[in-house]
């Protein structure tokens, strides 16, 4: 008869899990329970106001998003982890934003898509935990299911939810990705993080489109990240000028946050900028045909936007750029593009230059 290994003491198991998480490449981790009552009420209110735009999946799945035990029956605890993606400094980001000919791509999207990388590491982490504590039920998530990941991360002690709705770690800023493992292990839980924004409103004040309509209240319909990534139609005209040269996402509310002076700079090779996206100009990127777009965005989160939206976004950026010869030539090259969506945005951009 084979021997049955006794489960380790829950406190010892939790400590070992944290060690394994850090060995797996996660710079922060914590364990929390599954109670999200206040966050459920906040989510319901946000949905009722229609602030989610066309992201209809936010309203799907009922209360499973805020009730882990309904999404994955048997769940008792959630292991929340964070992986840094901060770059060497913020100067380069501000320099790009202030140079109208250059294209600004949100920092998280400059390198490899984090979803697959983190999911693989979380899966391996779960397997290592099983090898040490014995079989248990679990499910891994990386922005891939209805999960209130920031609320869970806050409760697990990883940081607090800032007024811009991003998670902030007092000792590491906000430049990090989140992932979770739902567990059926009765582990001791960590202390939730407390807020330290105080009276600061820098993120609210700097938002180019005034999308942060109140502390902890984001109107996605005005958010540049939503407009350039999630929204699949025409960008509202009153939003186009404020978008500036931001062609995929926006980081302003994080760049201005004082806590990011403590942000940890990643040494993860997969998060390094690809295809010179951190220095590319708008005309250069506008010249990509669909085949080149697909080739250069392989393994990148940018691919999910599709070539048409990519061109739509860059057209807006070109409309806001200084009217140099190459900017105008780039726009003229797509005046008669096959896509009506692209043509409309190119027409708007040309009009900004008096053409």
Swiss-Prot record:
What GO terms describe the biological role, i.e. biological process, of this protein? Answer: queuosine biosynthetic process; tRNA modification
GO molecular function terms attached to this record? 4 iron, 4 sulfur cluster binding; epoxyqueuosine reductase activity; metal ion binding
Grouped into one coarse class, the protein's main location is cytoplasm
Return the GO cellular component terms, semicolon-separated. cytoplasm
Q: Which reaction does it catalyse?
A: epoxyqueuosine(34) in tRNA + AH2 = queuosine(34) in tRNA + A + H2O
List ligand-binding residues for [4Fe-4S] cluster 1: 197, 200, 203, 257
Q: Return the Pfam families for the record.
A: Fer4_16, QueG_DUF1730
Q: Can you give the residue ranges of the 4Fe-4S ferredoxin-type domain? A: 185-217
Instruction: Identify the catalytic residues.
Output: 143 (proton donor)
Q: Where does [4Fe-4S] cluster 2 bind?
A: 207, 223, 250, 253
Cofactor(s) required, per the database record: cob(II)alamin; [4Fe-4S] cluster
PROSITE patterns linked to this entry: 4FE4S_FER_1, 4FE4S_FER_2
- Copy out the cofactor comment: Binds 2 [4Fe-4S] clusters per monomer.
What Gene3D superfamilies would the database entry show? 3.30.70.20
Q: Which UniProt keywords apply?
A: 4Fe-4S, Cytoplasm, Iron, Iron-sulfur, Metal-binding, Oxidoreductase, Queuosine biosynthesis, tRNA processing
The annotated subunit structure for this chain is: Monomer.
Q: What does this protein do?
A: Catalyzes the conversion of epoxyqueuosine (oQ) to queuosine (Q), which is a hypermodified base found in the wobble positions of tRNA(Asp), tRNA(Asn), tRNA(His) and tRNA(Tyr).
- Name of this chain's protein: Epoxyqueuosine reductase
